[in-house]
UniProtKB/Swiss-Prot annotation:
It is found in: Cytoplasm. Belongs to the GroES chaperonin family. Signal peptide: none annotated. GO terms for cellular component: cytoplasm. The gene is groES. Its main location: cytoplasm. Together with the chaperonin GroEL, plays an essential role in assisting protein folding. The GroEL-GroES system forms a nano-cage that allows encapsulation of the non-native substrate proteins and provides a physical environment optimized to promote and accelerate protein folding. GroES binds to the apical surface of the GroEL ring, thereby capping the opening of the GroEL channel. It comes from the Bacteria. This is Co-chaperonin GroES.
């Protein structure tokens, strides 16, 4: 899996949304 700023941002937003 490639870690990209945009990808990381999406993951973080999803985590925050589910938190």
């Amino acid at each position: 899996m490639k870690i990209t700023p945009l990808g990381d941002n999406v993951v973080i937003k999803k985590l925050l949304a589910t938190a």
